[in-house]
Amino acid sequence: MSFLRKKINDVIIESVEISRATFKEAEDFKKLLNQDIDGGYLKIIVDLSNCTFMDSTFLSTIVTALKKVNKIGGNLKLVGVHSETQALLELTGTIKVFEIYETKDEALKSFTVQSISK
């Protein structure tokens, strides 16, 4: 299993359960994220704790989902970003568009804080 989906209240957590996320897995992950967004989930966490490498195609899939969910008032946050992925985010400039958290709990709490402050 490459991906694991968990629902906590109105938040979806998509965990990438492979060490190397590449173009080979990007299409399947894109389908999952689109299912989440099309299903009405506006709060998405992508957990990369088990993923030590990501290529630009896989990153593009996540950026596209972020843009899609942002357009309808939602957000997508990253958790557990490893150093190689961090370097890719910095190199591509996409680090500026993501909220990144160390843990799922921190990301979940950030959604709660956003809801209260709106």
Residue ranges and their predicted role:
Residues 23-98:
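Amphipathic alpha-helical interaction surfaces in cytosolic regulatory modules
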Residues 2-31:
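STAS-typified acidic loop motif
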